[in-house]
Amino acid sequence: MATGGSGGGGGGGGGGDDVHGLKFGKKIYFEQDAAASASAAAVESSSTSSGGGGKKGKGVAAAAAPPPPLPPRCQVEGCGVDLSGVKPYYCRHKVCYMHAKEPIVVVAGLEQRFCQQCSRFHQLPEFDQEKKSCRRRLAGHNERRRKPTPGPLSSRYGRLAASFHEEPGRSRSFVVDFSYPRVPSSVRDAWPAIQPSDRMSGSIQWQGGHELHPHRSAVAGYSDHHAFSSHGGSAAGAPMLHHPAFELTSGGCLAGVATDSSCALSLLSTQPWDTTQSTSSHNRSPPMSSTASAFGGGNNPVSPSVMASNYMAASPGWNSSSRGHDGARNVHLPPPHGVVLNEVPPGSVHHGHFSGELELALQGGAPSNRPEAEHGSGSGAFSHSTNAMNWSL
């Protein structure tokens, strides 16, 4: 029993202790719970207070909305006109209609002018008062509106000039057409159809004249330039030899060609030139008939082989006082006595020297038959480039 009592006591004590402990623990528990509950309540109260504050902040933010924007006004000093009821252009650039066209306005303390091309205020040196636009914008505007000048090359090379005005850093490229130009049909029909194989016929007759002689340098002495006075002019009454059968060959033209381009036609042609009409009116003067009668008679025509030119005599007494085309002195030689003109051999026409018989005849008849200049002229009768005179005894 004691044990039990003791055990009971012990148990009671233990129970008291337990109760006391339980009480203490409970107390402790309740204290911890109270502290936890107090902390939880504090946290809850803080959360609720924060939540309430957030709701209140949203309301404050909603209540404190920004005021409506101010109406646009003109930025020119001293104006400040409300632009709410005007066009959007003036509202966007903040300038009234009146100051947009004023020549001088004050903006930000500077005298400026509104440019209606770029919609900005520019200072007066940058502005063109006549065009009412800034110079930079105006230059670009004119380049864009300028049209190329009309012409045959405007369609092909219209963009060539514009490419040189671009910025230096940009690459430039253009296309040039090197194709053969097309000849209009009107011009093409007006040109004569000339073939390379065409040649000038030998029957072409050149009408003689002072200005339109075909071969001035080749047939010197045959047309207007047949005789020269001591002053360089043509002799008015110098006797001349002329016959319609005379023909100037291409070889004769070659001997006297200097720079005359018309002689080139005779070089291309295989037929001889016919210069029967190349003498002027003064070649048919009365001294011609007298000279023709002296050489071959008035009725007998003089053959082409008899016509001579530029004979250089051995003695200085045979030279006249004036020079011809090629620098040699031209003389008028009457035929020596006993010379028959009709018996000249045809093969001796193109030789530049006399036969032995002719030289003897000329030396024998030279002192008595010296020619005298007619009509007071110092010129000879005729001049030719072959330098040949053929007479036979």
Swiss-Prot record:
The organism's place on the tree of life at top rank: Eukaryota
InterPro entries in UniProt: SBP-like, SBP_dom, SBP_sf
Tissue expression as described in the entry: Expressed in young panicles.
Biased composition (Basic residues): 137-148
Subcellular location: Nucleus
Region (Disordered): 40-67, 137-158, 273-301, 317-393
Pfam families, alphabetized: SBP
Keyword Nucleus tagged: yes
PANTHER family in UniProt: SQUAMOSA PROMOTER-BINDING-LIKE PROTEIN 4, SQUAMOSA PROMOTER-BINDING-LIKE PROTEIN 6
Domain description: The SBP-type zinc finger is required for the binding to DNA.
Protein name: Squamosa promoter-binding-like protein 17
Species whose genome carries this gene: Oryza sativa subsp. japonica (Rice)
Gene name of this polypeptide: SPL17
